[in-house]
Amino acid sequence: MNRNIFITLLISLLALSGCSGDTCIDPDDFGFIKFNISSRYDPSEVTSRQEGDQVAPWRDSAYKVNGYPLTIMVRPWDYMSGDKNTSGMLSAWCPWYGQQNNFTTLAEFCVRLRPCQFTDGKMCPTPTPRDAPINNAPCILTNGVGLYFLIADKGSNPNMSPDSQRSPKGITQHLGEPVASQDYEFYSISSTGKFLQAGGINYQYGCTSLPCDQASNYAQSSLYFKILDKFYDDNSGQYRVVIKSGVSDTRPDPLQFLTNLIKNELFGTSDKDPGIVRQTYQQIIETPGYRLSVSALLTLYIMFTGFSFLIGNINMTHVELVVRILKVSVVSILLSTSKAWTFFHDYLFVFFVEGLAQILQIVQDASTGQSLLSLLISPQTLSKLFSLLFVDPLGFIYIILYLIALYFIFLLIFKATIIYLTALITIGMIITMAPIFICFMLFNITRSLFENWLRQLISYAIQPIILFVGIAFIGMIIKTEIQSTLGFAVCKKDFPDLGPINQIFGSFTEDLDSSIGNSIFYWWFPVPMKGGIENFTQADILVPEDYTKKDGTKCLAYQCIDKRYIQLPFLDLVKDANRISNFINGKFVQLDGLLLIFVSIYLLSKFNDTAISTASFIAGTSGNLTSIQAVNQQSYDSIMKQVNRPINYATGVISKPINRMQEQTSMFFAEKYQGLMMSRLENKALSSSANKAVQNEVKRKYGIDHKDVNMQAGADYKNGISKLLDNKTFLPKGGDLDVKKLATMNFGQLRDEFAKNKYGAKNYSSLTSDQKLELDKFMKSDLGEKGKSAKSLRELASDANFTRDYQSAYKYAHKEMSGRGVGLFGKNIGVLRSWQEMENRMKTKRELKEQKRVAIGEKIYAGYTGLKRDALTAIVGKDLRDKYEGNLTSAEWHDFDYNDPQLRTYSESLKDKERAREVKELQMQINKETLAVQEDILSPEYLARLKRPSDVEYYQELGQRRLIHEVRDRLSEGSDPVIMGDRFMQEKATDDQMRTMIDNAHQKHAEFIDQDRYTRRQEHYDIMHEKAQENIDRTYKEIKDHFKRDDIKLEEMPALIAQYEREKPIESFDSKTELSLDKRIEEAVSNFNINAKNYEYSASVLNNIEERKQAITDEVNTQIDRINKYRENAKMPQYQKPVENSGRKLRKLEDHLRNMK
């Protein structure tokens, strides 16, 4: 039992160990905003009026200032002290020798240069020259020299034009000016654990105290940065910027996201998105019965007022008259549907919704800094926490107590959020009922109902205010204590120190993450870790917490200066002398501070419990009825659940077989109906009533134009087969064959069937050469009357196959359009179809966005459990890991899913889902390009017609990516997939299973080639190419023999053909033709040009088809090689050769003619 607890705690420590991305963390860093500012720009971003006078845009930090002291620090960097030239460490730049890849690194020449020095120590002396007076160039600039920030005026854009980039509107300050003149200094810990002086600025808007008018005017203004130079093309390097205070934290907060989501759903975001509350409110006041009731109440009220005045029942003073007129006016507004919501929202409801949000924002701003929860769980805080484990005997106890406190704080904050959301929803419900209760204010007998309604509204509005004021107050106590206790610097150290083994991992870990160090094993340790006053340094620094001076002046964080230890900036030298003494003596654990945290947690829990009753007391309502009703309802639901359990069980047992039978019956008729509808669609595709929109979709998605389809091809093919079967010389046993069945086969299948019937062979390939010649003689002979309409069986089969492909494409295009929401009217009305298509694209984008959002959470959790699993394996070994896995590491993420034919783990399924989303995004891109050109951009025909090589490469790249996914999907489908889960292949797959996978890969490769909609067209273009080649060869031979030349070029052929027709003997002409010489020349030249065009076009298409077949083959071989790699790792022999594609590369016409010499 004790061992289980120890392993659980140890794995928790490994899993929660913070990864901040830095080698060392500053003492006051509990989650600062950090980013890099590069000294280089893309050439397209830089403009120049003349050579050497470039201007670059300002970089938007994506943060807005909040009017409090803006404290920005630039990290120091010293190569000679051990800092590395990597994007994670570099904080310097060089104005010389930079290359295009030096956005985040220094040029090699600049790495070892010394920092720049300026004449008289001033970078910008007065009067300011054009160039900084550097006296040791070339050199590197550090500590913020050359870096400026800009607080832009509200509504202005500093990057609107080159002039605005040079002279932006707002506040600009240089971060590289020496801060010694300001009576304070910035210090930061380097990657080697040394405290170095850093650059930076503490800007307080020129105010003696904050807040002030100028600070308020610039609150929520955008913050920009830029390294100022006059020539950026040879710059290299970057600055690492740390924003310590003065900006609104826009980093994601899950609880804030949840509250905003519900609030926007209830109250909307704009007039176009009104929200549930406003919609319900509008529906109530727009109801005719309600308007009639309000009119009747107003009429009665006016009548009673007049009657009471006449009989002297009321004393109509000026005040009473004004009150009654106001009541009538307010209730009368409810009759105006267009103004009712605007009036009551702007003058009443806004105080309970927007006013509540503003008050909560004021409370949060008053607490300053980051939220309590983000501070407690930030990587920097956790890194400092876990650094106590090996430096103090009480470190382990402190960590456990801290985690327990964190758990309770999270529960309390979550509970407070639920209370706030409940209050928000209740306020929405109360506002929804406003049209009813506002009418109750007219009469004395119903006035109490209106007053109670208003009290409830006030009560639920006060609840969150009281709650979050308490959280902010107690949260400040906890934050102050955490900062004081963990306010020291930490650095990563190799732990355990493996000596020479660390060198093995050094280069690998540096490429992976420069912050890891020389080993994949590390831990955080405090700096300085050893006690002694000599390791601590005092200096005048900005106090990083809210602070009260000796004279009673209140200061915000980073507003005032005080002398403190730079290693312990949160501790006052006098007030916190005992804690400072403990740190100097090497005692880092402060248990008294932890006691204060637990006391604060207890107070916070009590405050949560009393917030609702306090708000109810203030508003004058008890608030007990809702709680009693909730308890009664929960008790009732629990009892009824127990009573109904046996009844529900008996009902389920009886209804299960009935439901199964109904489902099977419904499925049977549904399949029959679907088959009937699909058959009707295929027949409709060949009729004159075919839908034009679907035909255009077929052309756009499948590359088949209905104008190229012979609608009678199927009948012609069937007639050709019948005619051939009637020839008893050809097929003595032809009567045994079914013509209808043969008409569904392609030419290759039909030839195999004839070979089997005539010779008794297995297929055509097994015939002898003489038998093949005899069979080909009959099958390739023209079956029609001599002339243009006469075609061989091969041509008829090709046309019929093309027509069947068109029918299938029409059917699937119709189905896809229906799936995208394009209904019957949309298929016939262009405007409606465009609208429905746009809605489908928007829906698809939303679904992909939602899937990505869900996948991010799943991926984070999968990675988290994977980290725990790896940690457990490293500690206890694989065998013991399997024993503890079920309870400790969420094994379901890593176990096989036996319902999955691929036997993947859940984490592997997540990766495949991510690939599926990538396929959807890729398909959306392909659809967009297809829609633009109104053709199938992936078809070999379209690629053959393209003229620009860049377009061909772009579309081929899209097609290649799509084809890889198609092949992988084909290899993953079925009950015996080729692609299995990685863990199964590594640990469980047997020799027989892997052999079966490779055999299936060969089989699926053949099926894919045969069924692919593009490769199926090869026969059609083979025929076109052979006919064109045959005609060209015959013409070329005639010209060659006539002119006795062997060097005829393609461009000479039209002229030589014309000359040949003029010189041709009269005896060679057909007596039946009476064409003139000019007509004969025109026809001969035209025929040659058509044949040449068909030759080139068919050759290009066939080459594209061969490339597609080769790509399919390569991807299948990749998966076979993957399986053989697993076999090799398992010490199994390699099995079966890769799939081969006996492809060909057709020559261009010029090369073909040259080869005929």
Curated annotation (Swiss-Prot):
Record has Signal as a keyword: yes
Lipidation (N-palmitoyl cysteine): C19
Family in the record: Belongs to the TrbL/VirB6 family.
Superkingdom in the source lineage: Bacteria
Spans annotated as Disordered: 1134-1157
Residue spans of biased composition, Basic and acidic residues class: 1148-1157
Recorded topology in the membrane: Multi-pass membrane protein; Lipid-anchor
Database matches in InterPro entries: Conjugal_tfr_TrbL/VirB6
Principal subcellular localization: membrane
Compartment annotation: Cell membrane
Covalent lipidation (S-diacylglycerol cysteine), chain numbering: C19
Residues making up the signal peptide according to the UniProt record: 1-18
Protein name: Uncharacterized lipoprotein RBE_1261
